[in-house]
């Protein structure tokens, strides 16, 4: 009986290893300014409808303000502003992607969230300097069957906001 449970433990551990060793990741796809972007699902806590935001004095231009979610005060970063796109045509239809990056909780305001894609690391290309342009926040180009999506450096975006 003891050996059987040990064997079962080994099997379940190897399944976990097999699953984590698949060279795949899941990406939440969203749109800002008509363009498609992605964020690793491991950085996402939840996706919610926008809640009322309280403006804060002397905040960074990319920060819309803060809101309270289950007793936590969370800042809202407007990704359209970060990326230089015009404001959302229908802000009531926007979504908040609640993320946790380096133990900092933040809401990224996006215009829509479409789905989660499971992709392999081989589908992500490093952007060329030419295609990256002034958006140094872009760290990857995700090649999907019918479109491409940009992978942003969310930690860098937060770092830029906190430095200014």
Predicted features and spans:
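An acidic, low-aromatic, low-complexity terminal/linker signal
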Residues: 1-164
